[in-house]
Curated annotation (Swiss-Prot):
Entry superkingdom: Bacteria
Primary role: An essential GTPase that binds both GDP and GTP, with rapid nucleotide exchange. Plays a role in 16S rRNA processing and 30S ribosomal subunit biogenesis and possibly also in cell cycle regulation and energy metabolism.
Pfam family, any one: KH_2
Region (G1): 15-22
Protein name, entry field: GTPase Era
Subunit note: Monomer.
Gene Ontology terms: cellular component: cytosol; plasma membrane
């Protein structure tokens, strides 16, 4: 009697902030797990997205963008989390943006050169490159930087060539038993996903300055007798002025954030959600490593 083989492995998605790593992860999984926003530094935790297709299970680690500035404690922890997830994977997808190449890209590349895992280079946002004639020389320049397993021009936004990436990933998964049941999409708890959804809405509806000094704690997440969930979210900001900004004129801003977050939660949890949000000032949290650890920003996952 033959036993069917199964394949399973970890894949890190790395790159400087804002190149489209989370969008790529969401496309590879076919649904939204990692929060996406046009602001850099959106992903703060190493989200694991799981894609199981028949015998193949790919487990994706979505790293925060590696970046040069290490000034604040939160940035230091984010960089550590990104570096540590490069270490213990079967494959790395290095995402870069169109024909742009920055010192941050260079820094990520240097970390990858030291690693043992093969690297797929995903050149994202190629559909946005104005001068198509610049693309080929740039791809040749990239190819000379290190011995990549493959170089794939993609658009994570439209899905262009994302299936090519998925096929390369499948080909390089080692023979192993699956770590997760086949219907799992992420190993993060619903409570964690709820906080991520609220954070995404904060980033979407607030000005450029605010989001990095904002975090969300879920104080209550319980099932109710109506077959849904009662969720209380606490939004922590660093200053009184930011609190006013989050609440908005006569509470209009926080109301919008709550409505939009509730919609996404209901879709994700497939159940009715009663959501209440509060805003509280907790000064200096982004600079205090102890406070960060208590909020779940851990660097030794």
């Amino acid at each position: 009697m033959s036993i069917d083989k199964s394949y399973c492995g970890f894949i890190a998605i790395v790159g400087r902030p804002n190149v489209g790593k989370s969008t790529l992860l969401n496309k590879l999984l076919g649904q939204k797990i990692s929060i996406t926003s046009r602001k850099a530094q959106t992903t703060r935790h190493r989200i694991v997205g799981i894609h199981t297709e028949g015998a193949y299970q790919a487990i994706y680690v979505d790293t925060p963008g590696l970046h040069m500035e290490e000034k604040r404690a939160i940035n230091r922890l984010m960089n550590k989390a990104a570096s540590s997830s490069i270490g213990d994977v079967e494959l790395v997808i290095f995402v870069v943006e169109g024909t742009r190449w920055t010192p941050d890209d260079e820094m990520v590349l240097n970390k990858l050169r030291d690693g043992k895992a093969p690297v797929i280079l995903a050149v994202n946002k190629v559909d946005n490159v104005q001068e198509k004639a610049d693309l080929l020389p740039h791809l040749q320049f990239l190819a000379s930087q290190m011995n990549f397993l493959d170089i794939v021009p993609i658009s994570a936004e439209t899905g262009l060539n994302v299936d090519t990436i998925a096929a390369i990933v499948r080909k390089h998964l080692p023979e192993a038993t699956h770590h997760f049941p086949e219907d799992y999409i992420t190993d993060r708890s619903q409570r964690f996903m709820a906080s991520e959804i609220i954070r995404e809405k904060l980033m979407r509806f607030l000005g450029a300055e605010l989001p990095y000094s904002v975090t969300v704690e879920i104080e209550r997440f319980v099932s109710n007798e109506r077959g849904g969930y009662d969720i209380n979210g606490l939004i922590l900001v660093e200053r009184e002025g930011q609190k006013k900004m989050v609440i908005g004129n006569k509470g209009a801003k926080i109301k919008t954030i709550g409505i939009e977050a509730r919609k996404d939660m209901q879709e994700m949890f497939e159940a009715p959600v009663h959501l209440e949000l509060w805003v509280k000032v907790k000064s200096g949290w982004a600079d205090d490593e102890r406070a960060l650890r208590s909020l779940g920003y851990v660097d030794d996952l």
